[in-house]
């Protein structure tokens, strides 16, 4: 019997003492080094979701358009006309913190493999990114490195990066979030799944060679970031986008041949994960001979083979007798392809090396029957939240027509608006997306920054572009400050905003993929945030009929402060949502089209709050209060009206009110069109700063040409939602003017003055 490992050796694999005892009991013996490593990666939070799985079970996962839900490499929805969309979001947070370029690049590569492993051709990439403030040199290095990595991989692989979101906040200093989402188009009914089947069927290793890069990446991603994390740079993988481009084509050709029974990419935990998951999902076993695996380094031992996360690798189960056909396809594309094993009846993963058995573990022990922790939920909100909820608007200085006093200094509303437009979270992300190739494949309908959601034309390979009018819209959304202050309501708001952004381009929301980025679940506060956010997501998705098709959980996003205490990020449940566009020729952006168009607000300002707002954080340097709460009946009514107006051709511009409230939304529409506007604010008992900069759900600003306004207003009169005409689009080089009910000009600025800080905010900070 193998000698027991020391506690330090066990802990080094991320395994708790009680988990090691469980392993010994399951095997009936002590594991060897390779087996211990296999358990370490497969029982990590990154792979088995041992703290989050009970919470995820509450998500709605079924719907009339859902073809594949959670459990496969990606979700799949039915677009109609024989077309299907595969989509998924995943994180690469920890690798991007220690090696920003490669961490972000391989995050893109990994999510693309999830898509084409299903048999779908990748058609778009989106990203949800979070960084610390750019006045810190390390944060600037991480930010520029991540953007470089995303652009390098996406541009080289030939898939357009079409949208996403970027936030900056001290909560992410040293622990960035890099969440990558991808979409893929399927033209056949055949969906490639991961479950192995067919006793005796050959198992093929295809793609790149195996090296020592990415060793233990899954375990690394399941631990807090510390001062020693830079020593874990070998746990960051190195990607080759040109090789991945060949892998995409080879895999799609192989799937089309009908010779592939099942497929699984080698992502987290590499060979260990792909063999265990394929075997467990199929209820069979897999034997694999490591001596057959193509390598790029000499002297590798089983532990290294099994835990390597070298990129651009796949595992196939093939139809018997058709191995050579598949091998020839991959060789033609300049890729490795070998028969490395077979499917067996005994449901175990058996690994051979140099004529002996290197590892032998029941497949379900690695991939299905893993530890699950049911943690106790706090019976009341933690102290930080209760203290934050004590804040009231009356704690601020009075808001007068001339402005507000902040730290002894009078600021006009003009100055406040310019300050918000200069906030990197609100400001233009042009510095970022100008580095992305967003037009490759020639199907991008709206360029990044042009609308509230990305829109891509759905074009089958053999179709003429002019014949294709169906599109797909996609977005990633989460205001993490809301979730920090109230995880339940903040998560609902994230789902609602994602659907609202799709509705702003005229798309019907279909389904969700989620990326749960949180701190340690072993901290009662962290688990409270996670549990309530999951409850909020479930509620939001049920209300809006957008089932969850899968996603990713990234926990232990924490750094240590100067006293060695863990500092978690803001809880950040990113919602990736996709929608169907009936006719891409009717899609609208956020910029006003023409002078003289009417400007309308769908929804009401009555639900505005300064709690958790960008105004409160940026202008008053305060994070407190209750965030906005979603009225889903109102939310659905507002979105329905917006979609209907776009479909009828009445609405020619739409933009939701998010960070910065009504004033920032209108300023962004003015900047996008370079047209001014005169806005008449309604009479209100609200504070002026709440009316101007307060935030709430369920508000969309739209523009309508004069000839369509009677029909539009007649339609709205028959709907059960509040709305009002705010004003009229002005002229080029005009001013954006806000006038209150007493005819006072609260804000009056040339569009050029709005544009300058908004357009240059990020670039200026990078030069500092």
Swiss-Prot record:
<keyword id="KW-0067">ATP-binding</keyword>
<keyword id="KW-0460">Magnesium</keyword>
<feature type="active site">
    <location>
        <position position="46"/>
    </location>
</feature>
<comment type="similarity">
    <text>Belongs to the FGAMS family.</text>
</comment>
<feature type="binding site">
    <location>
        <position position="514"/>
    </location>
    <ligand>
        <name>ATP</name>
    </ligand>
</feature>
<feature type="binding site">
    <location>
        <position position="88"/>
    </location>
    <ligand>
        <name>ATP</name>
    </ligand>
</feature>
<comment type="function">
    <text>Part of the phosphoribosylformylglycinamidine synthase complex involved in the purines biosynthetic pathway. Catalyzes the ATP-dependent conversion of formylglycinamide ribonucleotide (FGAR) and glutamine to yield formylglycinamidine ribonucleotide (FGAM) and glutamate. The FGAM synthase complex is composed of three subunits. PurQ produces an ammonia molecule by converting glutamine to glutamate. PurL transfers the ammonia molecule to FGAR to form FGAM in an ATP-dependent manner.</text>
</comment>
<feature type="binding site">
    <location>
        <position position="237"/>
    </location>
    <ligand>
        <name>substrate</name>
    </ligand>
</feature>
<feature type="binding site">
    <location>
        <position position="113"/>
    </location>
    <ligand>
        <name>substrate</name>
    </ligand>
</feature>
<keyword id="KW-0479">Metal-binding</keyword>
<keyword id="KW-0658">Purine biosynthesis</keyword>
<feature type="binding site">
    <location>
        <position position="554"/>
    </location>
    <ligand>
        <name>substrate</name>
    </ligand>
</feature>
<comment type="pathway">
    <text>Purine metabolism; IMP biosynthesis via de novo pathway; 5-amino-1-(5-phospho-D-ribosyl)imidazole from N(2)-formyl-N(1)-(5-phospho-D-ribosyl)glycinamide: step 1/2.</text>
</comment>
<dbReference type="GO" id="GO:0005737">
    <property type="term" value="C:cytoplasm"/>
</dbReference>
<dbReference type="InterPro" id="IPR041609">
    <property type="entry name" value="PurL_linker"/>
</dbReference>
<dbReference type="GO" id="GO:0009228">
    <property type="term" value="P:thiamine biosynthetic process"/>
</dbReference>
<dbReference type="GO" id="GO:0000287">
    <property type="term" value="F:magnesium ion binding"/>
</dbReference>
<dbReference type="Pfam" id="PF18072">
    <property type="entry name" value="FGAR-AT_linker"/>
</dbReference>
<feature type="binding site">
    <location>
        <position position="265"/>
    </location>
    <ligand>
        <name>Mg(2+) 2</name>
    </ligand>
</feature>
<dbReference type="InterPro" id="IPR010918">
    <property type="entry name" value="PurM-like_C_dom"/>
</dbReference>
<feature type="binding site">
    <location>
        <position position="551"/>
    </location>
    <ligand>
        <name>ATP</name>
    </ligand>
</feature>
<feature type="binding site">
    <location>
        <position position="49"/>
    </location>
    <ligand>
        <name>ATP</name>
    </ligand>
</feature>
<keyword id="KW-0547">Nucleotide-binding</keyword>
<feature type="binding site">
    <location>
        <begin position="309"/>
        <end position="311"/>
    </location>
    <ligand>
        <name>substrate</name>
    </ligand>
</feature>
<dbReference type="Pfam" id="PF02769">
    <property type="entry name" value="AIRS_C"/>
</dbReference>
<protein>
    <recommendedName>
        <fullName>Phosphoribosylformylglycinamidine synthase subunit PurL</fullName>
        <ecNumber>6.3.5.3</ecNumber>
    </recommendedName>
</protein>
<dbReference type="GO" id="GO:0009229">
    <property type="term" value="P:thiamine diphosphate biosynthetic process"/>
</dbReference>
<dbReference type="InterPro" id="IPR010074">
    <property type="entry name" value="PRibForGlyAmidine_synth_PurL"/>
</dbReference>
<dbReference type="GO" id="GO:0009030">
    <property type="term" value="F:thiamine-phosphate kinase activity"/>
</dbReference>
<feature type="active site" description="Proton acceptor">
    <location>
        <position position="92"/>
    </location>
</feature>
<feature type="binding site">
    <location>
        <position position="552"/>
    </location>
    <ligand>
        <name>Mg(2+) 1</name>
    </ligand>
</feature>
<comment type="subunit">
    <text>Monomer. Part of the FGAM synthase complex composed of 1 PurL, 1 PurQ and 2 PurS subunits.</text>
</comment>
<dbReference type="GO" id="GO:0005524">
    <property type="term" value="F:ATP binding"/>
</dbReference>
<keyword id="KW-0436">Ligase</keyword>
<dbReference type="GO" id="GO:0006189">
    <property type="term" value="P:'de novo' IMP biosynthetic process"/>
</dbReference>
<dbReference type="GO" id="GO:0004642">
    <property type="term" value="F:phosphoribosylformylglycinamidine synthase activity"/>
</dbReference>
<feature type="binding site">
    <location>
        <position position="90"/>
    </location>
    <ligand>
        <name>Mg(2+) 1</name>
    </ligand>
</feature>
<dbReference type="InterPro" id="IPR036676">
    <property type="entry name" value="PurM-like_C_sf"/>
</dbReference>
<keyword id="KW-0963">Cytoplasm</keyword>
<feature type="binding site">
    <location>
        <begin position="91"/>
        <end position="94"/>
    </location>
    <ligand>
        <name>substrate</name>
    </ligand>
</feature>
<feature type="binding site">
    <location>
        <position position="114"/>
    </location>
    <ligand>
        <name>Mg(2+) 2</name>
    </ligand>
</feature>
<dbReference type="InterPro" id="IPR016188">
    <property type="entry name" value="PurM-like_N"/>
</dbReference>
């Amino acid at each position: 019997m193998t000698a027991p490992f020391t506690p330090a050796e066990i802990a080094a694999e991320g395994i708790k003492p009680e988990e090691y005892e469980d392993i010994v009991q399951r095997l009936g013996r002590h594991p060897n080094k390779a087996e211990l490593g296999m358990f370490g990666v497969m029982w990590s939070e990154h792979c088995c979701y041992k703290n989050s799985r009970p919470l995820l079970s509450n998500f709605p996962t079924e719907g009339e358009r859902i073809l594949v839900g959670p459990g496969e490499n990606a979700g799949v929805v039915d677009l109609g006309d024989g077309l299907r969309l595969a989509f998924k979001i995943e994180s690469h947070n920890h690798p991007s913190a220690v090696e920003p370029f490669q961490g972000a690049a391989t995050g893109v590569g990994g999510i693309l493999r999830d898509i084409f492993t299903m048999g779908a051709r990748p058609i778009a990439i989106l990203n949800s990114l979070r960084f610390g403030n750019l006045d810190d040199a390390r944060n600037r290095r991480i930010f520029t490195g991540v953007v470089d990595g995303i652009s390098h991989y996406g541009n080289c692989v030939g898939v357009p990066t079409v949208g996403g979101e970027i936030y900056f906040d001290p909560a992410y200093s040293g622990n960035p979030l890099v969440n990558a989402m991808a979409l893929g188009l399927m033209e056949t009914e055949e969906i490639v799944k991961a479950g192995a089947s067919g006793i005796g069927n050959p198992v093929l290793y295809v793609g790149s060679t195996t090296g020592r890069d990415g060793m233990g990446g899954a375990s690394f991603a399941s631990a807090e970031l510390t001062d020693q994390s830079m020593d874990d740079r070998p746990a960051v993988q190195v990607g080759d986008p040109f090789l991945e481009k060949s892998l995409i084509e080879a895999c799609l050709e192989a799937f089309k041949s009908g010779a592939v029974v099942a497929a699984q990419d080698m992502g987290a935990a590499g060979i260990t994960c792909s063999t265990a998951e394929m075997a467990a999902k199929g209820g069979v076993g897999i034997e694999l001979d490591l001596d057959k695996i193509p390598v790029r380094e000499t002297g590798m031992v089983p532990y290294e083979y099994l835990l390597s996360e070298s990129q651009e690798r796949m595992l196939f189960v093939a139809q018997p007798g058709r191995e050579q056909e598949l091998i020839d396809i991959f060789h033609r594309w300049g890729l490795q392809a070998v028969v490395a094993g077979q499917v067996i009846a005994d449901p175990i993963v058996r690994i051979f090396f140099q004529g002996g058995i290197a590892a032998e573990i029941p497949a379900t022990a690695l991939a299905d029957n893993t530890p699950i922790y049911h943690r106790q939920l706090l019976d009341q909100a933690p102290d930080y939240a209760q203290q934050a909820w004590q804040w009231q608007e009356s704690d601020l200085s009075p808001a007068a027509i001339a402005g507000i006093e902040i730290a002894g200094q009078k600021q006009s509303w003009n100055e406040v608006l310019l300050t918000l437009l200069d906030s990197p979270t609100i400001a233009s992300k042009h510095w970022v997306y100008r580095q992305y190739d967003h037009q490759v494949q020639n199907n991008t309908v709206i360029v990044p920054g042009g609308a509230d959601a990305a829109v891509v034309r759905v074009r089958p390979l053999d179709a003429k572009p002019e014949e294709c009018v169906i599109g797909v819209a996609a977005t990633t959304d989460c205001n993490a400050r809301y979730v920090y202050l109230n995880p339940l309501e903040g998560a609902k708001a994230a789902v609602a905003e994602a659907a609202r952004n799709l509705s702003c381009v005229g798309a019907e929301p279909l389904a969700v993929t989620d990326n749960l980025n949180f701190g340690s679940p072993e901290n009662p506060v962290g688990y409270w945030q996670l549990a309530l956010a999951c409850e909020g997501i479930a509620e939001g998705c049920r209300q809006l009929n957008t089932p969850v098709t899968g996603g990713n959980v990234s926990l232990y996003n924490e750094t240590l402060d100067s006293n060695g205490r863990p500092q978690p990020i803001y809880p950040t449940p990113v919602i990736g949502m996709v929608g169907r566009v009936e006719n891409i020729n009717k899609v609208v952006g956020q910029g006003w089209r023409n002078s003289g168009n009417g400007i309308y607000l769908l929804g009401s300002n009555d639900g505005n709050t300064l709690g958790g707002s960008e105004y409160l954080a940026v202008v008053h340097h305060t994070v407190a209060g209750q965030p906005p709460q979603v009225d889903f009946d109102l939310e659905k009514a507002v979105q329905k009206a917006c979609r209907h107006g776009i479909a009828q051709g009445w609405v020619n511009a739409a933009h939701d009110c998010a960070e910065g409230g009504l004033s920032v939304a209108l300023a962004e529409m003015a900047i996008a069109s370079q047209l001014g506007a005169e806005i008449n604010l309604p009479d209100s008992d609200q504070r002026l700063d709440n009316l101007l900069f307060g935030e709430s759900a369920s508000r969309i600003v739209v523009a309508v040409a004069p000839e369509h306004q009677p029909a539009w207003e007649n339609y709205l009169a028959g709907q059960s939602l509040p709305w009002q005409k705010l004003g009229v689009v002005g002229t080029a080089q005009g001013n954006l003017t806000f006038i209150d009910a007493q005819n006072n000009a609260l804000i009056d600025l040339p569009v050029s003055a709005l544009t300058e800080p908004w357009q240059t905010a990020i670039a200026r900070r990078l030069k500092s």
